Amino acid sequence: MEAVTLSEARVYVGTYNKYNSGSLFGKWLDLSDYSDKDEFMEACRELHKDDQDPEFMFQDYENIPEALISESWLSEKFFELRDAIEKLSETEQEAFFVWCDHHNSDISEEDADDLISSFEDEYQGEYKDEEDYAYEIVEECYDLPKFAKTYFDYSAFARDLFITDYWMDNGFVFRCA
């Protein structure tokens, strides 16, 4: 999945009426300017107040996962999720969406705080490879003498860790739930 930064989400808002009449008139709206979906929809209505009953068309968007938007729909959960992940670093936000993809989490339906909590329980960090993570586990959890560490098979240990207890994607390591 391409890196997504919800705080920088934007939507190009037009209407089906204008589009079907040959006009692509619309405007990019930054979702960071709105606290919730109602406020965003009010801005859409104001933008297209010349349409009697505008049917909004989200013709393009940036920094919004496809699970949260389509041409004619923006999830109610977008604003909740955007606000919930603000406490995560940029790297953690990227890892969060990798984790969501792996778990097939329906971010348009699930509670944002529950998703973040589950993610934080499983996320271990970013590593260059599985062996790099195994090396850290040995350093933190095992009191091996320096002599023994030179003979330790980190590759085999990493293989064993990632067979059952951990998984890695795009450099992000997660504990299996």
Please place each PLM-identified region on the residue numbering.
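N-terminal ordered "arm"
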Residues: 2-50
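Structured domain cores in non-transmembrane regions
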Residues: 35-106
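Exposed alpha-helical structural elements
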Residues: 39-43, 80, 95, 111-114, ...
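Extracytoplasmic/secretory-pathway segments with low complexity and glycosylation-like composition
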Residues: 95-141, 174-177
